[in-house]
């Protein structure tokens, strides 16, 4: 090999190594909980659906949408949910929908259009339950009445009326961040353990634990 060619090869190798170092510095590998926690949320949401629906029926999954932004963590939740639900043959995932959660000038659960959520539910009249990774909108009493007969599992606790929604039987289960530390101090390992360490499932039975 000519000396000039050897120098060129060495320069290319050095540039490649430098690029790899810069990439790892600027874009380090995510901490385990970065993917394990959303996976655990997806698993726990499916388990809550099975519990609430009696292991049978049709489920519609509702994902949050923020314009054109694609959140990879939501994709992890979705995949874990679908995989866990698929183990229960009599409970099927009949549809997956997305709903805008950040209308201009709003934030949190208030950023979702209640009318859009209501229309989504009406489009799936044959569904037994709905699992919303987009939280639950703030409905009027009249609008809530139109949701009777359906069961809802909600991921998120931004709705200030969540406690009354649970005790009133509108929402069957909510997956929310823990208000008190988990009983175990052991560092979580699996995705499900990460969920249990940081979140909890709230139903009508323990809704008083909510603030």
Where are these regions (language model features)?
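A residue-level marker of the well-folded mature domains of exported/periplasmic proteins
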Residues: 2-211
């Amino acid at each position: 090999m000519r000396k000039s060619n050897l120098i060129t090869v060495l320069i290319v190798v050095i540039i490649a190594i430098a690029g790899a170092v810069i990439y790892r510095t600027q874009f380090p590998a995510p901490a385990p909980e970065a993917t394990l926690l959303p996976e655990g949320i997806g698993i726990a949401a499916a388990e809550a659906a099975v519990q609430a629906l009696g292991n049978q029926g049709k489920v519609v999954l509702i994902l949050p949408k923020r314009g054109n932004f694609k959140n990879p963590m939501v994709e992890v939740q979705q995949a874990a949910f679908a995989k866990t639900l698929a183990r229960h043959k009599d409970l099927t995932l009949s549809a997956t929908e997305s709903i805008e959660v950040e209308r201009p000038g709003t934030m949190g659960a208030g950023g979702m259009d209640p009318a859009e959520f209501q229309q989504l539910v009406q489009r799936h009249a044959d569904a037994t339950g709905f699992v919303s990774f987009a939280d639950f909108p703030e409905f009027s009493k009249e609008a809530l009445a139109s949701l009777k007969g359906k069961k809802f599992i909600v991921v998120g606790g931004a709705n200030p009326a969540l406690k009354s929604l649970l005790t009133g039987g509108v929402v069957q289960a909510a997956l929310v961040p823990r208000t008190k530390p988990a009983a175990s101090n052991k560092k979580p390992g699996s995705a499900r353990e990460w969920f249990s360490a940081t979140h909890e499932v709230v139903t009508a039975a323990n809704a008083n634990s909510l603030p």
